[in-house]
């Protein structure tokens, strides 16, 4: 594992995780060339530090590179030219995540009326981009109607977020395989089922419908359920949630995260890999292959485990 900085023990209160994300593609015929690009490296921020990261690709690529996009996400590119029937991409990370400041949710802008978090009219606000609808549009009358009960006038922002997350959690059924990455928010509204990506996108559409700046967040969720409690959905899988922009002191802002899949606000169990306006900005992997293969199978496995000490092993 290549370290971004010296591997020291995490600070008090910080949670250290090891994340192993493995994707395997199997094809019915030989693939002569594979191009891939994805977002698999956890971000660095005030409360998250990617201590080390390694991306292993088998067969080994003839060309690979890493870059940073306009949102600050780390994008990895590779080109495999060796003929193959199986392609395996393994991302291995060590990440430190600190808990939110004690006053993030129970005080400050989170307790202000939700209308105060609208970036419109704030000088030089870069968050305005995150208020805009997508193409094709997601903000419809049906979305506005669904959002309305949560957005009562002058209601504290944190209450809006909790209520919206809770309503989506209650009103919709988590059903793996019920949607695809191209399923629209309004289709999810009609079907009343989906997966974490769908529920995050619905929450984002509701927030934007009311003039708030909201972003799509991809990453991982670490859970260690109490005795007798069910494990939360999202364990050992990629996860997605929503965040809303809030102005803090002059020149500063915070993203407040909400997870409608699990009916909770975001804390130190959430590991951020990418932020964007939608899933399409931060997919874990996408690519192009050259082959006569008629069939393919993809297997994805994710392990998120607490990590102690300062020794790393392959």
Q: Predicted regions: what is each one?
A:
Residues 1-145, 154:
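Linear, non-domain "peripheral" regions
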Residues 3-4, 166, 198-290, 294:
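Hydrophobic/aromatic-rich core segments of domains that either
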Residues 12, 189-193, 231:
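Alpha-helix N-cap/helix-initiation motif
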Residues 21-23, 91-93, 164, 242, ...:
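A structural signal for short, well-ordered beta-strand segments
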Residues 23, 179, 261:
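Ser/Thr-centric signal marking residues that sit
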Residues 38-48, 53-56, 262-292, 296-299, ...:
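Glycine-rich, small/acidic residue-mixed loop/short-helix segments
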Residues 101, 107-110, 170, 177-185, ...:
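Glycine-rich, flexible loop/turn motifs
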Residues 113-194, 202, 210, 277-279, ...:
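Secondary-structure boundary elements
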